[in-house]
C-alpha cells in the first residue's frame, strides 16, 4: 500500500508541475496576443480608428521598417528589454486598467459608433497625454536614448535632445503626431460615419 501511495504522490506532483507550466505558458501567450497590434486594431472595436491613425503616424509606418506597436508605447513596462516577476505583474495590472477603460466605454455606449468615438477622442487623448507626462515619457525613453540622437542632415537635433537627457520632458510638444495621425480618420468619419478600412 505504501508503494502505491508513493507512486500516486509522484504522479500528483508531476501532474501539478505540468499543469503549472501549461498555465503559465497559456497566460503569457494570452497576454502577448492581447498586447499585439492585430488584437488592438481588429479584435478591439473601440480601437479601429486609433489603429488606422497609428498606421498614418511615424511609429506605424517608419521608412526604416521599424515600428513601435500599441504595447510599446501604452504599457508602462512593455519597452523594457527584460521584465522581472514584479515588472510583469505591474505590466498585467496596467493592461487590466487600460482594457477596462476601452471595454467599459464600449459597454456603456461611449465608443459604440464611429461618431461617438470621434466625440470622445479629445478627452481620451488628453488622458493618455496625462499618463505619458505623469511617467516622464518612460515608454518613449525605453526605445529612444536621447544621448544618442543624431541626424546627419541636421546635427543640432542630437544637441537639442541631449539637453533633455536627465530632465523632465514633453516629447509630444514637438512630436505630436508621431504615434497617431488622426487627420484622415477624423475626416473619413465625418464624411462617411464609419471607420476607414484597415488594410491587413
What kind of region is each of these model predictions?
Residues 2-200:
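Short sequence/structural segments immediately N-terminal
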Amino acid at each position: 500500500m505504501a508503494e502505491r501511495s508513493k507512486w500516486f504522490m509522484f504522479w500528483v506532483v508531476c501532474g501539478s508541475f505540468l499543469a503549472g507550466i501549461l498555465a503559465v505558458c497559456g497566460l503569457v501567450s494570452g497576454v502577448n496576443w492581447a498586447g499585439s497590434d492585430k488584437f488592438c486594431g481588429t479584435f478591439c472595436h473601440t480601437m479601429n480608428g486609433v489603429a488606422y491613425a497609428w498606421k498614418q503616424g511615424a511609429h506605424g509606418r517608419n521608412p526604416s521598417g521599424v515600428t513601435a506597436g500599441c504595447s510599446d508605447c501604452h504599457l508602462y513596462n512593455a519597452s523594457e528589454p527584460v521584465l522581472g516577476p514584479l515588472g510583469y505583474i505591474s505590466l498585467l495590472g496596467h493592461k487590466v486598467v487600460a482594457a477596462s477603460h476601452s471595454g467599459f466605454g464600449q459597454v456603456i455606449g461611449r465608443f459604440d459608433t464611429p461618431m461617438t468615438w470621434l466625440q470622445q477622442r479629445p478627452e481620451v487623448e488628453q488622458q493618455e497625454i496625462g499618463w505619458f507626462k505623469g511617467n516622464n515619457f518612460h515608454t518613449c525613453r525605453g526605445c529612444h536614448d536621447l544621448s544618442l540622437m543624431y541626424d546627419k542632415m541636421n546635427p543640432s537635433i542630437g544637441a537639442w535632445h541631449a539637453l533633455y537627457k536627465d530632465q523632465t520632458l514633453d516629447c509630444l510638444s514637438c512630436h505630436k503626431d508621431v504615434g497617431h495621425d488622426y487627420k484622415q480618420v477624423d475626416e473619413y468619419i465625418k464624411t462617411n460615419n464609419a471607420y476607414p478600412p484597415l488594410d491587413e
